[in-house]
Amino acid sequence: MNNQSFNNFSQVNSNSSFFADKPKNLQNTNLEMTNGTNPPSSFSKQTPQKRQSFGTNTNFSKGNSSRGSTSNKRKVLSVSQILARVNQKKQRKLEQKKRKKPLKPIIPPKSFILLFKDKPEKYVYNRRIIDYKHCGLLQRYIGLGGKILPRRQTKLTAKQQRYVAKTIKSARIMGLLPFVTKERSFFR
């Protein structure tokens, strides 16, 4: 509600018979209350006091009314509070990674070709099956320098790690994967 419209309302009502009995000082206190200052303790005429602000930059001009009721206060945080926030963010990221279970690659069985020949209508390429043609999966197990990542980083079993290393080497020989660095499309 605008202060101007409230002041106009109080001026209109001050002409009525109800407000005629009240002293003028009481009407001044009403105006002071609408202006945002503290009302005086007695009805004697006092000058409005300015509010003191310590360390905060509050601006009550009409130009700020378009932003809404947001204030321009900045919080000063201690080092322990900053570290606590950083730790909370790290924990949230770890929880999100735990929720997103990484695809564990599957070593194809020896009778893999027979499975596809028996049921051609169910020929759906499983994204997790390790294959020299599946470059997107193999790129996960190659470091930035082009080296095959160790088991500690890939979190694969020993058998899976050997199979991944063998398929990466065969994909490199066939020209599907680079020897030195990762493909440019991986970074997009």
Swiss-Prot record:
A cellular component annotation (GO) from this entry: mitochondrial small ribosomal subunit
A GO molecular-function descriptor: structural constituent of ribosome
Record keywords, A-Z: Chloroplast, Plastid, Ribonucleoprotein, Ribosomal protein, RNA-binding, rRNA-binding
Main location: plastid
Skewed-composition ranges (Polar residues): 25-71
Source organism (scientific name): Tetradesmus obliquus (Green alga)
Compartment annotation: Plastid, Chloroplast
Protein name: Small ribosomal subunit protein bS18c
GO biological process, one term: translation
Subunit structure: Part of the 30S ribosomal subunit.
InterPro entries: Ribosomal_bS18, Ribosomal_bS18_sf
Biological classification of the source: Eukaryota, Viridiplantae, Chlorophyta, core chlorophytes, Chlorophyceae
Organism superkingdom: Eukaryota
NCBIfam families in the record: S18
